[in-house]
């Protein structure tokens, strides 16, 4: 096992001037499970392929442990890779597929069999060792691909969207198995996905990329609670965070018919940038619903005593999920229509076409600079 270091590693494809990966700088600890996540074209798979030796590194360096592997061929890096497609040999049994790399390396049959059986036991594949891949389900085939990587006992596992071909239910159970197995083996793992739910549930840390640039690397909890900028705020979380540009007013920001208090430091930082507005982020679960004619929360002040507190939201769609419900609606903010998502109790969902008044909880408010997108609140 070993640590992995991306030291300002860059990749520029021939014929392009814009880097696909731009000075990526991440230190991955020995035994850590790091997830690279981002939209299509952000550079996450390219970063993984650079680490694997399948892409040239045009600037910076990549190290595995104390070794600079920047220009080493893949076979000399002591890594094992699991792909989106299983890449199993259809004419070979499960056991032969899992042990094939060891056979090519000249390991004796007894040792190969022992390692294959040990990996099969970990992956619940013992009863399938004599079967061909066509006799397995998608989840079982993916576990065979995992087993093939495990028997090699590499220093680093690389996984490129290994769950993309599985159905939703199987994806949930398999991601749990992969995370549990990685913790048991303690092998440093770099995992690529476009699914931020996978990223949050599997990784010790998550690295978010956009247009080849690292936006933030942090624990899943910190990334959810303290996104570094507007992109991360809008990308991490399902349903996504509501992002609303609101005017700065005395002591806070104007939110519908209420003034929501915001720290003076954040407002000063926005003013120093010449901004007269800030963009506030509110998770769907951090809205309070105000009854018609009811008062605002104690921490809020109202512009008018006649109107309900907060922002009027027209209910367009309601998703009932048992314990919770999600209201998808629209509101007028600064003369523009904004789509909002509000979480409500599963037993108290509003009717489609009705109107809610909502206020954000001040302690849960995220404040970003409208001009730059960077976070202003602690």
Predicted features and spans:
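A short, flexible loop at the N-terminus of ABC-type nucleotide-binding domains that lies
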Residues: 1-3, 11-23, 72-76
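ABC ATPase nucleotide-binding domain
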Residues: 5, 27, 63, 357-359
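Conserved post-Walker A/P-loop segment of ABC ATPase nucleotide-binding domains
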Residues: 15, 55-63
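The feature captures the beta-strand-to-loop junction immediately N-terminal to the Walker
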Residues: 37-39
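Helix-to-loop junction immediately C-terminal to a conserved catalytic motif
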Residues: 52
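ATP-binding/catalytic-site motifs of ATP-hydrolyzing domains
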Residues: 61-63, 67, 213
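ABC ATPase nucleotide-binding domains
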Residues: 74-231, 235
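Non-catalytic connector elements of ABC transporters
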Residues: 239, 252-378
């Amino acid at each position: 096992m070993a640590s992995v270091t991306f030291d300002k590693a860059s990749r520029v494809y021939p014929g392009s001037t814009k880097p696909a990966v731009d000075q990526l700088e991440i230190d991955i600890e020995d035994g850590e499970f790091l997830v690279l996540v981002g939209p299509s074209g952000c550079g996450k798979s390219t970063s993984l392929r650079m680490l694997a030796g399948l892409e040239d590194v045009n600037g910076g360096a990549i190290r595995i442990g104390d070794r600079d592997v920047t220009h080493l061929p893949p076979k000399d890096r002591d890594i094992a890779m699991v792909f989106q497609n299983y890449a199993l040999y259809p004419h070979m049994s499960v056991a032969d597929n899992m042990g094939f790399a060891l056979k090519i390396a000249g390991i004796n049959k007894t040792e190969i069999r022992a390692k294959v059986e040990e990996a099969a036991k970990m992956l619940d594949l013992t009863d399938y060792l004599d079967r061909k891949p066509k006799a397995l389900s998608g989840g079982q085939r993916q576990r065979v691909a995992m087993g093939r990587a495990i028997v090699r006992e590499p220093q680093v596992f690389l996984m490129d969207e290994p769950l993309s071909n599985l159905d939703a239910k199987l994806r949930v159970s398999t991601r749990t198995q992969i995370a549990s197995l990685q913790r048991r083996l303690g092998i440093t793992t770099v995992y690529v996905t476009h699914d931020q739910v996978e990223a949050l549930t599997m990784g010790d840390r998550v690295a978010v990329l956009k247009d080849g640039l690292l936006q933030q690397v942090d624990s899943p909890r910190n990334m959810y609670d303290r996104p570094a900028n507007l992109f991360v705020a809008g990308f991490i979380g399902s349903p996504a965070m509501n992002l609303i540009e609101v005017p700065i007013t005395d002591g806070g920001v104007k939110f519908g018919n209420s003034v929501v208090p915001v720290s003076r430091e954040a407002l000063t930082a926005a003013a120093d940038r010449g901004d007269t507005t800030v963009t506030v982020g509110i998770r769907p679960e951090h809205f309070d619903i105000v009854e018609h004619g009811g008062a605002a929360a104690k921490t809020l002040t109202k512009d008018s005593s006649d109107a309900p507190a907060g922002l009027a939201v027209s209910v367009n769609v309601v998703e009932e999920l048992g314990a919770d419900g999600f209201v998808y609606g629209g509101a007028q903010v600064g003369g523009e229509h904004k789509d909002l998502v509000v979480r409500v109790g599963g037993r108290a969902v509003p009717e489609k076409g009705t109107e809610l008044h909502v206020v954000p909880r001040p302690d849960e408010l995220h404040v970003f600079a409208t001009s730059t997108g960077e976070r202003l609140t602690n």
